[in-house]
Amino acid sequence: MHNTNHISIWKPLSNRPFRLLWTANIVSLIGTWTHEVGASWLMTSLTLSPFMVAMVQTATTLPFFLFSLPAGAMADIFDRRRLLIFTQLLMLTAALLLGITTIFFKITPFILLTFTFFLSLGASINAPAWQSIIPELVSRKELVSAITLGSVSFNIARVAGPALGGLIVAA
C-alpha cells in the first residue's frame, strides 16, 4: 500500500527560516570538525608531549560531559533563537581569537586548550537549542524530514570538516 502522507526529505528546506538555520548549522559544524584536526596538529607543533595532544580531545569533549544536561534545560528556559545566536557568537569569538593568537605566534598549549574548551562549550550549548528549535520552524508533517536533515548536516560536517582540516594542515 502506498503512503500518501509521504513528505520529501528536502521539503523543510523550502522553509526559509529552517533552510537558513540548517545552512548555518552545517557551516558551524564543519568549522568545529576542522578545528579538531587543526588543534591536534597545532598541539603537536607546540609540544612533543603525547599527554598534551590527548588534552586537546579532553578539552573538546569535557564541555559536552559537563554541560549537556544544563544546556538542555537552558534550551527549554531561554529563547532558543537568542541562545543559538549567543553560542554561535561565542564560538566565532573563540575561533577568531585563537586564529589571531596563532597568527601572531603567541599561541601556547594552555591557550590552545582554553580556546578549544570554549569552542566546545559553545557547541555543547548550541546542540540542544538547535534540536529544540526545529519543531518551531517546520510543520508537524515536515518534522521527521527536518530531524533527518539535521542528522544529515552533522554527518556531512563530520566528513567535510576533517577533510578541510587536513587540507589546511597540509597547505
Which residues are covered by each model-predicted region?
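Alpha-helical transmembrane-bundle signature of multi-pass membrane transport and export proteins
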Residues: 1-171
